[in-house]
């Protein structure tokens, strides 16, 4: 399925789900709420020029889709992967609106990244790319505007490089990026948090909806990234009983 089809499918599924609510509230249609939700408030595209270890200038594309800030600053990760393009980021940003709103925290939805492939690159090359990326991105983000995080290929190392460049340019030490190391403002157990959340959410759903628990059950986990790995660790521990 192409990324445009994925975006349209996600929009269609959301609209089908909320259709009964919309039918009871014609004022939503009059205000164009649905049309506004599916159109990003802002799409930022920029060139990222950086120098590799051979002294050659490389050029990548950078993106930040600031989808919706109705309930708070844009919030969503940065992804570095060769498959990244505007369509991918738009699809992920739309999903981020809904995920963030479900937390009940005042966070809007956004997503960003680049088609840069860190695989096979040295630490110095990754650092120079991150610095060049943030040099362009920094004018569009801020603790009250847009707070990026990590995603695929953007972990603690990359967040550190990005945050360092942000501080250098903006001359401020603020909560503009999540996923930082504990040494400079990061949160304890952030790496495990999403995977653990899957366990606790499923555990609570079983209890509330089925009056049941994990005891005696086989759990199937899809994937092998940070979310899946830490979900498996908690599922197989005594804490999941």
Task: Please annotate each region the language model reported.
Residues 1-5, 235-241:
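Conserved small/polar residues in nucleotide/adenosyl-binding loops
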Residues 4-188, 192, 201:
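N-terminal ligand-binding/catalytic initiation module
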Residues 68, 102, 211, 232, ...:
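A generic "cationic amphipathic patch" detector
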Residues 192, 196-237:
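Glycine-rich phosphate/diphosphate-binding loop of Rossmann-like nucleotide-binding domains
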